[in-house]
């Protein structure tokens, strides 16, 4: 088959893998709710944890992480090189954030980004988990904790002597969910008042943080 056609197939497959609306389905199946209307209204696993249940949250987290890794694995299975695999990873994030099934209103791409970076640099997983747990224990703020923990993958890419392309790609993957979360961070800050931003970050009800 023509190589261009294979690339197109890989990219389309990656988008549809990413667009699987696991948080939405979990809300509907396990509690009969639209996850986009409760809690933080985010189509993410943390919102499922707090408003649907622990095990549905675990399931959604696993699916969303798996989407990023699966998109790259499928491209690899189709015989595509690392460059195309990286493009497929970005398509998976695009699918997660803008799913065609939900009028292009999805999540922030955090868990999917974790799956991508874990597939690319599995040696970074223990460091990421350690960073997340430490920050979560200190701040009790999931968004801040895993947002900062993302930076550990960039450090792994750099110290692990990965090529510059992989380092820059890791930076791009990390920045996407961080940028997506900026409006949410501003919302929390505005609700608490400019003088109480710190209190909003460290004391705000957990159900509204993601």
Swiss-Prot record:
SMART domains xrefs: G3P_acyltransf (SM01207)
Enzyme class: transferase
Single GO term (MF): acyl-phosphate glycerol-3-phosphate acyltransferase activity
Biological process, per Gene Ontology: phospholipid biosynthetic process
Record field: catalytic activity: an acyl phosphate + sn-glycerol 3-phosphate = a 1-acyl-sn-glycero-3-phosphate + phosphate
Entry similarity comment: Belongs to the PlsY family.
PANTHER family associated with the record: GLYCEROL-3-PHOSPHATE ACYLTRANSFERASE-RELATED, INNER MEMBRANE PROTEIN YGIH
HAMAP family xref list: PlsY
Name the record gives this protein: Glycerol-3-phosphate acyltransferase 2
Native species: Dehalococcoides mccartyi (strain ATCC BAA-2266 / KCTC 15142 / 195)
